[in-house]
């Protein structure tokens, strides 16, 4: 029964493993996935939409809005004197529209009604009704004269949105480059595993040969043990790189959840072709004697930062400005209050409307509203300094990144290319030496320790070559993060 259960469990695991859809991993197949399902992609979109929402909020200040209110008040309080009646019930309504404009102007228009009743010792007021139309105007005469501040606020939001659009493109490019980094790390890891598998195979062959020679009495247990240790060492290193591969696979599946249900495996790749593509791209980069501004969008970001800084400084400078406004309004009213000669008055909404149409009760108001802040100079100066410093820091950071990335990475790539050439020459020399050492070992002219030392030197040289090639690729990726429009094949994948 126990064996049956184990067999069923193994069959279930095997079925699950085979039921997973396979996915052949290449640069193009990664980028062909639905990148929009990636969490990091969502974060990029969220950051952009946050900037977009902030820009729209600024624009919403200058959109019309409808407002209104309705109220009913009632009390059982009695009038003490006839000249001061207690109005109950009272009903008030108002409906209107208002809008602020970018020129420092705001206006509103509203229609309202009022109906109330009251009683006094000398009579009764029943449904006394009033209807009114009011138009109000407010003009900024100083602080926002001709829309100086409202325009600065709108333009600042517009520049922020344009910058967010460009930064979204840059971040999306950075994300895809990050996926490609992971892919090439997996390729390098696979090459490292191949190196250790090859050396492990050689070590196993040498171990088998040593055991034969021990059986023939040619060698002793010490040499066999040395080869056994070498096999274990090679296997341990191979398992370590297999562990690294699983970590890279986990990293890739975290970046692309679409791969979580798939059995992912590296598709065949062409390293010589990749090297030629990389070298062609490095040649394009190295051919630029000066910083190729046409290859980057960072300069557009810095220009927009400067424009935003200018508008934000205007807003900060107005913090303690005098606030002087003209306020005016026009109102026309209709009243319904018909007396019967006995101290009783009645009215209705209809009568109020008719009175409004038949009698001109138009009135107007005009005035100035003045506010002068006192003691806010230090706050204004601090705000101005804050806007100046924070934008200066962002601009300098971008400008430095543009210049340094081109100047230094060109040198770094050249140095790494020299390292690869040197390592290849070193590997070829070590390969020739290893062949000689193997022959000498078979002739009993060198010790097993000397042979293993030469094998380790050859191994390390190959590993360094692989790692350096990966460094070149990552360095180019660093360059393409800034110079996203570099015209080379490696950047068009």
Model-derived features: positions:
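Strand-connecting loop/turn motifs
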Residues: 3, 61-65, 102-104, 132, ...
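Acidic, low-complexity, intrinsically disordered peripheral segments
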Residues: 6, 18, 76, 240, ...
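N-terminal signal peptide c-region/cleavage motif recognized by signal peptidases
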Residues: 12-14
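Bacterial Sec-pathway N-terminal export signals of envelope proteins
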Residues: 19-92, 142-152, 156-158, 165-166, ...
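Periplasmic alpha-helical coiled-coil/stalk elements that build and connect Gram-negative outer-membrane
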Residues: 25, 159, 165-293, 412, ...
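Amphipathic alpha-helical coiled-coil segments
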Residues: 41-58, 171-198, 205-207, 230-231, ...
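Sec/SRP-type N-terminal targeting helices
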Residues: 42-46, 59, 102-127, 142-167, ...
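Small/polar, glycine/serine/threonine/aspartate-rich low-complexity segments that form flexible
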Residues: 70-139, 272-280, 314, 327-374, ...
């Amino acid at each position: 029964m126990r064996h049956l259960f184990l067999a069923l469990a193994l069959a279930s695991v095997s079925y699950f493993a085979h039921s997973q859809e396979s996915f052949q991993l290449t640069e193009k197949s990664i980028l062909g996935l639905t990148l929009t399902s990636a969490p990091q992609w969502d974060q990029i979109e969220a950051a952009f939409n946050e900037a977009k929402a902030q820009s729209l909020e600024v624009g919403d200040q200058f959109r019309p809005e409808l407002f209104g209110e309705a109220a009913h008040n009632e009390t059982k309080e009695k009038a003490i004197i006839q000249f001061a009646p207690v109005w109950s019930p009272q009903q008030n309504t108002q409906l209107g529209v208002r809008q602020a404009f970018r020129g420092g102007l705001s206006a509103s228009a509203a229609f309202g009604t009022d109906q109330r009743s009251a009683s006094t010792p000398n009579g009764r007021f029943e449904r006394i009704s009033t209807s009114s139309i009011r138009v109000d105007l407010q003009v900024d005469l100083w602080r926002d004269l001709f829309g100086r501040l409202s325009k600065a606020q709108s333009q600042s939001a517009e520049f922020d949105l344009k910058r967010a659009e460009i930064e979204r493109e840059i971040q999306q490019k950075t994300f895809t480059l990050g996926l490609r980094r992971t892919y090439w790390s997996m390729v390098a890891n696979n090459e490292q595993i191949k190196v250790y598998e090859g050396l492990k195979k050689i070590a196993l062959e040498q171990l088998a040969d040593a055991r034969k020679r021990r059986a023939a009495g040619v060698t002793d247990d010490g040499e066999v043990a040395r080869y056994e240790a070498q096999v274990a060492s090679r296997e341990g290193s191979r398992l370590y790189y297999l562990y690294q591969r699983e970590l890279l696979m986990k990293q890739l599946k975290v970046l692309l959840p679409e791969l979580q249900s798939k059995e992912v495996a590296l598709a065949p790749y062409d390293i010589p072709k990749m090297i030629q593509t990389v070298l062609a791209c490095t040649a394009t980069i190295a051919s630029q004697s000066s910083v190729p501004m046409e290859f980057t969008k960072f300069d557009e970001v810095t220009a927009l930062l400067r424009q935003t800084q200018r508008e934000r400084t205007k807003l900060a400078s107005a913090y303690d400005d005098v606030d002087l406004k003209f306020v005016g309004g026009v109102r026309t009213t209709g009243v319904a209050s018909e007396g019967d000669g006995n101290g009783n008055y009645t009215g209705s909404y209809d009568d109020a409307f008719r009175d409004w149409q038949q009698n001109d009760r138009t009135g107007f108001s005009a005035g100035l509203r003045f506010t002068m802040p006192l003691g806010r100079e230090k706050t204004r100066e601090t705000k101005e300094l804050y806007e100046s410093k924070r934008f200066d820091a962002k601009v300098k950071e971008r400008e430095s990144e543009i210049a340094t990335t081109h100047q230094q990475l060109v040198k770094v790539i050249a140095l790494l290319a020299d390292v690869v050439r040197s390592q290849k020459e070193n590997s070829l020399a070590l390969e020739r030496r290893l062949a000689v050492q193997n022959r000498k070992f078979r002739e009993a002219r060198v010790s097993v320790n000397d042979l293993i030392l030469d094998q380790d030197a050859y191994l390390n040289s190959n590993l360094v070559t692989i790692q350096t090639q990966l460094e070149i690729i990552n360095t180019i990726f660093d360059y393409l993060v800034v110079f996203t429009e570099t015209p080379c094949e490696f950047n068009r994948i």
